[in-house]
């Protein structure tokens, strides 16, 4: 891509993650949540078919989690395929087409969100989401 085409794309993607007004700000001045959203925008610049997220909210202050989840929800609504490792069970239940629950490195459930959260088969799966969702 030409240098001339980079800036408009960057601004469009920063706008998509709610940070267009921070386009001229140094990364060190951004909060953790803002830095995470910039990372998502950078990834989107590559036009991926699939986005991989590994605990995208785990290092964030609780008040910043919602902004990241909102960006991810928008990506899901736009049709982006995402593989996400998360402990955010409410998010997984709302956004996922498929939920895989792992315990000690093994897949113990692989279901639709409805099935996973209303009729889990594995004892560990039964305990975990309800414990997280009822915090």
Where are these regions (language model features)?
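Conserved ABC ATPase "signature" region
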Residues: 4-21
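Conserved ABC ATPase signature
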Residues: 26-30, 34
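Hydrophobic anchor residue at the start of the ABC signature
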Residues: 40
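A short, proline-enriched helix->beta-strand linker immediately N-terminal to the Walker B motif
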Residues: 45-49
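Catalytic Walker B motif of ABC-type/P-loop ATPase nucleotide-binding domains
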Residues: 51-54
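H-loop/switch region of ABC-family ATPase nucleotide-binding domains
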Residues: 86-87
